[in-house]
Amino acid sequence: MVENQKAMPQPEMRRIRRIHFVGIGGVGMCGIAEVLLNLGYEVSGSDLKASPVTERLESFGAQIFIGHRAENAAAADVLVVSSAVNTSNPEVATALERRIPVVPRAEMLAELMRYRHGIAVAGTHGKTTTTSLIASVFAAGGLDPTFVIGGRLNAAGTNAQLGTSRYLIAEADESDASFLHLQPLVAVVTNIDADHMATYDGDFNKLKKTFVEFLHNLPFYGLAVMCLDDPVVREILPLVKRPTVTYGFSEDADVRAINVRQQGMQTFFTVLRPDREPLDVSVNMPGNHNVLNSLATICIATDEGVSDEAIVQGLSGFQGVGRRFQVYGELPVDGGNVMLVDDYGHHPTEVAAVIKAVRGGWPERRLVMVYQPHRYSRTRDLYDDFVNVLADANVLLLMEVYPAGEEPIPGADSRKLCNSIRQRGQLDPIYIERGVDLAPLVKPLLRAGDILLCQGAGDIGGLAPKLLKSELFAGAVAASVEGKLK
């Protein structure tokens, strides 16, 4: 946590003194809560269970309640809620009854951004990594930004930090269309893909129009940074009536990458920018998708006057984000070791990008995947895409779908996914019942030199650390924060 530094003056929210977060342990909520704590507000919050996140906030002065009860919100001047919280929640019901304002998290983020130089990163994929890269490069350039990220920035040990400069860098969440609350000065659109379609009534055109509306929240002197490699971003570009800069591998992009070369975790490439000398950079993340994330960062850093030296330093020194191709360590097996990787990818596009990165960085190694689909609705809507991409693993174990509050949907489960993948004839997936200890199932499948990838947005996030500590893998070697083996 940043001590109570002198930051850009934050206009007082009139009578607001105590801010209560319903679901404060959520990744989108805790960061905003931490920044508000550092700004001097009283912060309280509730969640269903304690976690390292709630314990961290409590150590900084937040009052944490376990469980949702009406009295938790009694002293609040405003309630902050995520889209997962509805009016049946007793704290929300009490606030509404007492005429205490109830605002979505994005509206509170917009309030923080309103008086700062806001940089908002939107897109179906790559938001967290791109936001983190921008924060890293700005820090290397001495700009000390405030940031709110949807993942743990390894170098900072947190997903939010109050900086001393005018910059606020944050993710813009399209999943519930709440990014329309934001009014940044600079906005990034990394890509636009079919996800969270219930928010948009299943209408992809509505999703595209909402992204255009988000970009039109920019002032006339703002900047839209857009990935030209994404066909949908390219399609909406003529509709955006704001200054734009494009990036990608495409020859007609304003800022583009050439000479890409991957060596394990490191990716090297050359950046071409208008009226600039070519710039050779490297980033400690594999895959072309991370080259694109880096290009978005370079566009913004260049526009804000960050030196090339700081850009190179910020990218090369980037230590990654929690659960984004996070190397946990090495597991011992007969004849050698297996590299253990954890990743948050839960959309077929993200899964494909990670598999491609593994093939590019370690072409000689087998990929053993433990995958947990996230949400029955996503599994149903993108079923064929999941079948196609998961079939590219060498060995596949499929955990049952993580429901994320949804009821099961017939035909949208992991057992059926296994059958569909098996019918392709490429590999024979193994179905994993809910609650099964995976270590005894995984170990016999591993060979020396394999890469074991645990992937998904549900509780599979706890699998990699469990495997590292399992007695079946005694002698496992943990990686350092930046993913290097100790």
UniProtKB/Swiss-Prot annotation:
Subcellular location: Cytoplasm
Main location: cytoplasm
E.C. number(s) listed in UniProt: 6.3.2.8
Top-rank taxon: Bacteria
CC terms in the record's Gene Ontology section: cytoplasm
Coiled coil: none
Keyword Oxidoreductase appears in the UniProt entry: no
Pathway the protein takes part in: Cell wall biogenesis; peptidoglycan biosynthesis
Pfam family, one: Mur_ligase
Catalytic reaction equation(s): UDP-N-acetyl-alpha-D-muramate + L-alanine + ATP = UDP-N-acetyl-alpha-D-muramoyl-L-alanine + ADP + phosphate + H(+)
Chain positions recorded as ATP binding sites: 123-129
Hydrolase recorded as keyword: no
A GO term, aspect molecular function: UDP-N-acetylmuramate-L-alanine ligase activity
Keywords (A to Z) from UniProt: ATP-binding, Cell cycle, Cell division, Cell shape, Cell wall biogenesis/degradation, Cytoplasm, Ligase, Nucleotide-binding, Peptidoglycan synthesis
SUPFAM superfamilies, sorted: MurCD N-terminal domain (SSF51984), MurD-like peptide ligases, catalytic domain (SSF53623), MurD-like peptide ligases, peptide-binding domain (SSF53244)
GO process annotations (BP): cell division; cell wall organization; peptidoglycan biosynthetic process; regulation of cell shape
Family matches, as InterPro entries: Mur-like_cat_sf, Mur_ligase_C, Mur_ligase_C_dom_sf, Mur_ligase_cen, Mur_ligase_N, MurCDEF_pg_biosynth, UDP-N-AcMur_Ala_ligase_MurC
Family as reported in the entry's similarity comment: Belongs to the MurCDEF family.
Biological role: Cell wall formation.
NCBIfam families: murC (TIGR01082)
Protein name: UDP-N-acetylmuramate--L-alanine ligase
Organism of this sequence: Pseudomonas fluorescens (strain Pf0-1)
